[in-house]
């Protein structure tokens, strides 16, 4: 048991009290006080991992125009930076009335302080928001009078420090959306009938009509305006004022343009305009003025057409226009249209370059729509900005109408503006948009990954039904931008991704990744961020290309990648850039898989996804074998407490830490204690420092859920043996030691929230009370005088949490009852029990109660007088049927929990914790788990390379600090730059002996194991080591379900399905066939009638069982009556005949008394015996 004791002893360590088993050092890490992981990395990373939440926070700061964003924009050299809200107000202003005599303009958006802190918003179901004010100016153009006012524009949801929003008390995340960028796209297709290569181009705006040009099989160039009918492109040019001579002068080099001009029958601008108008507005009488206005509005007016800054940038870049000039206009220009047509013509004629009028030469080539140079991110700021734009445009209509109806003298900005459309648009986005999602709070990593998620779905994006293979596939331009591993399995595969570790989003929304600049074959530490299309023009070397001390490449020819992901060797002088890190291409979750390079990508995908499903355990334990990403991920996830300034710890308790800063100020950090996360897991923070300790700014001073010493700790280090065991671990089943149950090694706490409200009803107000009719004192024992369960009470399913009574409809009273009323007053008033009870299959301990009352001036929904929330915590030990997984996609369900004495044990008597089957490794090709097991054993037992005998080759490659390690050392093996196979073999041969002087595991990683039942050794050595195992959210307690009687469907009267509805198991068509095959006629009859939807029969059978009588004959199922009704609704006269041909009359809905009897039977079996079902019927 020695290994287990050592592993658990690490729990009591703190950042302030270093010990040999866990040395403390900040030498290898930029975070002060961080645990010192000995790293197998060979490469120096010149760039730290950027802020992992920057994709969310930076975007929101741009939206609100925060001072921090303005500073960073000034550093980038942006001229006159404009925030997102300012941009919308600028676009909207001025709003003019129909005559142009009045105008209203908006400027200077600003915020007041937020109304309540984050914790209070969560507690009271409020939205974390700040009041938004703008300056509105009303100008009377006739008199020149200006009225200016500050106008309240509603409460604006604000982002928390963690990159989330609190909407009505729930934490939500706005996911970034991957969309096709506005711009001009050239495409190539093969005509099926002639096998000709045809070319087309689309000009896609951010907002407005599409413009499409194409060359058809008859070699004419056509145009489609706003997806209407095709017409010759020369018609559009003539409509823009070009003469035939000008067209020939510009496009005379092209045969297809000359033939198009010959086939065009229109003469002059006017005729061309009318021709376009007829195509766009068929049925309306065309006039030259209306045609001119229509064409101008479609493409050349900012109100109707917007390429956006990014679209303008893409068009200029593709066509070589206005290169180097600042972007001013966001509409199309005549020059754009002409350059696009020329580019298309030259592309069709096979030319490779084109010189535009400015003298710039641009390459002529088709576009790949799945290339990351053509796909951009709509981050949270832009998504909210678009929604505000929608709300503002709705408000604009209201303002215009009010300008015409109100008295000019009395008008003020306040009287014109109705903020409801804007507030409604923002609420609609946060409450119902596909991109505003309930935050995944299973553990800190799942929350962090959710904030870095990229989705191609949502409004303006793709739909999973129409998305093909190409858009889902991994593309070479994803390198360093979107992780090729982490994506969901199932229908969303490839449509939802995750941002790579070093990636960032530029102001245009394109994802950039950093590279080290290479100058004349020398690698510098200068970092350059490149977008995907900029990278295509360069030659990039890998991060692990060998370089000497001066930064020169060691080898004369270097492995590089060029455009479209082609890999080749080139002379070192031709290299332009080099990767900054080997983990540059993967996401945070994928970067936390050690030995990722030895795993098949499919299994690595499962490993990355399953880390997000790990539940926080009662005691967290950092992995012995990490990747160096654990610390940064935990800090950026925001669930640990970090010291803001340097100082000394003055006071520590379980609930708070007080720090005396060096500048003399104090700061108290409050701990989050046993709070419920969005997914019912337990979020608890514990201090890891002691009074008197010195802490630096940025140091972790308290752990959160799934963290240990500030590092991400999603599972436990368990002693694993990889072998079959009596067939009990067949098909990925797992065998566990009972030690893990007894010592709460894999125990987790789950907290459920139960809520009930007391409302006003038509018959009177509901009441929360202890005085509940027909309930015994035993049941009420745990309720206080208000009728609310006490904190600390153990509750099981069916127990009352909150007593509540609801008034019943007054029935006609008998004379005797009236007499009783007269004597005893209102006491006998009719109420029914509507108490909050513990749902089926749940139990636990009450750990918290929150009561909100209108009397205490709490904000409650209309009609609600009182609201009570009860929190029930459940301690779940690991049990058969729970799902466990490693980090390599090696998942399984616990098939058997063995007593410790029956588990296989090592030569020193240490029993293993977990047995995995060998069959789970070879065909799945996730060899990383085996290497992790070996290195885990080395880390647990410690090692020492004896330098006196000479340092072997494998050890010569390692830094000096890796030549010796104490037992329980924590190591990191970064992805693509970790421990090599030779190093692992060497370390296994150098492991330290145990206290008896025995080395238990051989140099090949195998040990002699003994059968716990017989004490005999197994016939062959077995791989033994330490593997990091996580307990996943798929717990058997949540899945197991059984029903006796329960709710029925209203129409068919058949039992409902599913655990949530307390439903039954469906006995389907194929199961019926199985019964028929066995000839089990009576069982089948019962299944189809009294166990299902024979309403009368059900009650009679229940009655018979209770009384111990024989089961009566079944009646007619309700579904048969439903079938009859459906046939009758089709005007078919259907009759039911008995076996002798006589018509049977089906009674419409059996007696109400019978239904009442059924209800009573279902709930209360101790009712009066005299009232039998037969008597009632």
Curated annotation (Swiss-Prot):
Annotated region described as Disordered, given as residue ranges: 1-36
Annotated EC: 2.7.7.6
GO biological process: DNA-templated transcription
A molecular function GO annotation: DNA binding
Low complexity bias locations: 17-32
Transmembrane annotation, as ranges: none
Catalytic reaction(s) noted: RNA(n) + a ribonucleoside 5'-triphosphate = RNA(n+1) + diphosphate
Keywords: DNA-directed RNA polymerase, Nucleotidyltransferase, Transcription, Transferase
Recorded GO CC terms: DNA-directed RNA polymerase complex
Highest taxon listed in the record's lineage: Bacteria
Pfam families: RNA_pol_Rpb2_1, RNA_pol_Rpb2_2, RNA_pol_Rpb2_3, RNA_pol_Rpb2_45, RNA_pol_Rpb2_6, RNA_pol_Rpb2_7
Family: Belongs to the RNA polymerase beta chain family.
Functional note: DNA-dependent RNA polymerase catalyzes the transcription of DNA into RNA using the four ribonucleoside triphosphates as substrates.
Subunit structure: The RNAP catalytic core consists of 2 alpha, 1 beta, 1 beta' and 1 omega subunit. When a sigma factor is associated with the core the holoenzyme is formed, which can initiate transcription.
Name of the protein in its database record: DNA-directed RNA polymerase subunit beta
Species whose genome carries this gene: Mycobacterium tuberculosis (strain ATCC 25177 / H37Ra)
């Amino acid at each position: 048991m020695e290994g287990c004791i050592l592993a658990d002893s690490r729990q009591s360590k703190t950042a302030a009290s270093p010990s040999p088993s866990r040395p403390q050092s900040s030498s290898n890490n930029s975070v002060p006080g961080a645990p010192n992981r000995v790293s197998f990395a060979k490469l120096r990373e010149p760039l730290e991992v950027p802020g992992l939440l920057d994709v969310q926070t930076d975007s929101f700061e741009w939206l609100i125009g925060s001072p921090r964003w303005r500073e960073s924009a000034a550093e980038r050299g942006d001229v006159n930076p404009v925030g997102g809200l300012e941009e919308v107000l600028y676009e909207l202003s001025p709003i003019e009335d129909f005559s142009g005599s009045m105008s209203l303009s908006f400027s200077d958006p600003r915020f007041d302080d937020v109304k309540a802190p984050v914790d209070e918003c969560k507690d009271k179901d409020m939205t974390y928001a700040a009041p938004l004010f703008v300056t509105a100016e009303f100008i009377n153009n006739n008199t020149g009078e200006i009225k200016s006012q500050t106008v309240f524009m509603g409460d604006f949801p604000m982002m928390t420090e963690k990159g989330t929003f609190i909407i009505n008390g729930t934490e939500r995340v706005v996911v970034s959306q991957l969309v096709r960028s506005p711009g001009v796209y050239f495409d190539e297709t093969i005509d099926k009938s002639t096998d000709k290569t045809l070319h087309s181009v689309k000009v896609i705006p951010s907002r407005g009509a599409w413009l499409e040009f194409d060359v058809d099989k008859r070699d004419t160039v056509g145009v489609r305006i706003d997806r209407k009918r095709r017409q010759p492109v020369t018609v559009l040019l003539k409509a823009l004022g070009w003469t035939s001579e000008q067209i020939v002068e510009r496009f005379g080099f092209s045969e297809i343009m000359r033939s198009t001009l010959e086939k065009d029958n229109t003469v002059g601008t006017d005729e061309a305009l009318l021709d376009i108008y007829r195509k766009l507005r068929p049925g309306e009488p065309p006039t030259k003025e209306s045609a001119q206005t229509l064409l101008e509005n479609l493409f050349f007016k900012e109100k109707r057409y917007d390429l956006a800054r990014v679209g303008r940038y893409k068009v200029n870049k593709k066509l070589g226009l206005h290169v180097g000039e600042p972007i001013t206009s966001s509409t199309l220009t005549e020059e754009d249209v002409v350059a696009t047509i020329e580019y298309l013509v030259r592309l069709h004629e096979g030319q490779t370059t084109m010189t535009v009028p400015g003298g710039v030469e641009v390459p002529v080539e088709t576009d790949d729509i799945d290339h990351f140079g053509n796909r951009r991110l709509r981050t949270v700021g832009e998504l909210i900005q678009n929604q505000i734009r929608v709300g503002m445009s709705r408000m604009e209509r209201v303002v215009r109408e009010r300008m015409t109806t109100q008295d000019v003298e009395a008008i003020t900005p306040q009287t014109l503006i109705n903020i409801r459309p804007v507030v409604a648009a923002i609420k609609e986005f946060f409450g119902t948009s596909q991109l505003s999602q309930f935050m995944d709070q299973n553990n800190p990593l799942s929350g962090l990954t959710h904030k870095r998620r990229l989705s191609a779905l949502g409004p303006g994006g793709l739909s999973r039904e129409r998305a093909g293979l190409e858009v889902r596939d991994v593309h070479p331009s994803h390198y360093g931008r979107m992780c090729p591993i982490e994506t969901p399995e199932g229908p969303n595969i490839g449509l939802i991704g995750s941002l790579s570790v070093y990636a960032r989003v530029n102001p245009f929304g394109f994802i950039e990744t950093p590279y080290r600049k290479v100058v004349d074959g020398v690698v510098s530490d200068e970092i350059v961020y490149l977008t995907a299309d900029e990278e295509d023009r360069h030659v990039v070397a890998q991060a692990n290309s060998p370089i000497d001390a001066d930064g020169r490449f060691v080898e004369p020819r270097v492995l590089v990648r060029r455009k479209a992901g082609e890999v080749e060797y080139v002379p070192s002088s031709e290299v332009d850039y080099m990767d900054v890190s080997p983990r540059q291409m993967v996401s945070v979750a994928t970067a936390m898989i050690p030995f990722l390079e030895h795993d098949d990508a499919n299994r690595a995908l499962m490993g990355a996804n399953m880390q997000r499903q790990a539940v926080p355990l009662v005691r967290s334990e950092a992995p012995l074998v990490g990747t160096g990403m654990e610390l940064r991920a935990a800090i950026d996830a925001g669930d640990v407490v970090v010291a803001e300034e340097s100082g000394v710890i003055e006071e520590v308790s379980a609930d708070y830490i007080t720090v005396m800063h060096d500048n003399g100020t104090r700061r108290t950090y409050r701990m989050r204690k046993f709070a419920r996360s969005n997914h019912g897991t337990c979020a608890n923070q514990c201090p890891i420092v002691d009074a008197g300790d010195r802490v630096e700014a940025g140091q972790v001073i308290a752990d959160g859920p799934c963290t240990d010493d500030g590092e991400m700790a999603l599972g436990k280090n368990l002693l694993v043996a990889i072998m079959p065991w009596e067939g009990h671990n067949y098909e990925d089943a797992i065998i566990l030691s009972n030690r893990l149950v007894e010592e709460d090694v894999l125990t987790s706490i789950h907290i459920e929230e139960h809520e009930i409200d007391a409302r006003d009803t038509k018959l009177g107000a509901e009441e929360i009370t202890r005085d509940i009719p027909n309930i015994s004192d035993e049941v009420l024992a745990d309720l206080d005088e208000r009728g609310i369960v006490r904190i600390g009470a153990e509750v099981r399913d069916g127990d009352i949490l909150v007593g509540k009574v609801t008034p019943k409809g007054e029935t006609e009273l008998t004379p005797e009852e009236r007499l009783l009323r007269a004597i005893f007053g209102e006491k006998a008033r009719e109420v029914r029990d509507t108490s909050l009870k513990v749902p089926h299959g749940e139990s636990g301990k009450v750990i918290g109660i929150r009561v909100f009352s209108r009397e205490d001036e709490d904000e409650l929904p209309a009609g609600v007088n009182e609201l009570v929330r009860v929190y029930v915590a459940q301690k779940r030990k690991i049990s058969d049927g729970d799902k466990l997984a490693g980090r390599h996609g090696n998942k399984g369900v616990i098939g058997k929990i063995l007593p410790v004495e029956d588990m296989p044990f090592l030569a020193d008597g240490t029993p293993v914790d977990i047995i995995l089957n060998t069959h789970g490794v070879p065909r799945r090709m996730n060899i990383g788990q085996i290497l992790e097991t070996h290195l885990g054993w080395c880390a647990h037992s410690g090692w020492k390379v004896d330098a006196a005998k000479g340092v072997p080759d494998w050890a010569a490659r390692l830094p000096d600090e890796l030549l010796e390690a104490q037992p329980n050392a924590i190591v990191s093996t970064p992805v693509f730059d970790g421990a090599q196979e030779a190093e692992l073999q060497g370390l296994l041969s150098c492991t330290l002996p145990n206290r008896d002087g025995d080395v238990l595991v051989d140099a090949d990683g195998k040990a002699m194991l003994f059968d716990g039942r017989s004490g005999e050794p197994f016939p062959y050595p077995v791989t033994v080591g330490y593997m990091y195992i996580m307990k996943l959210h798929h717990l058997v307690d949540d899945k197991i379900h059984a029903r006796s009687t329960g709710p029925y469907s209203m129409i068919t009267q058949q039992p409902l399905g599913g655990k949530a509805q307390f439903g039954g198991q469906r006995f389907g068509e194929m199961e019926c066939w199985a019964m028929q095959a066995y000839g089990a006629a009576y069982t089948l009859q019962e299944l189809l009638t009294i166990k299902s939807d024979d309403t009368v029969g059900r009650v009679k059978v229940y009655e018979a069982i209770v009384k111990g009588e024989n089961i009566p004959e079944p009646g007619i199922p309700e579904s048969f009556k439903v079938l009859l009704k459906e046939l009758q609704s089709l005007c078919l006269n259907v009759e039911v005949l008995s076996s002798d041909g006589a018509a049977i009359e089906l009674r419409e809905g059996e007696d109400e008394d019978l239904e009442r009897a059924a209800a009573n039977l279902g709930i209360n079996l101790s009712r009066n015996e005299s009232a039998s079902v037969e008597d009632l019927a």
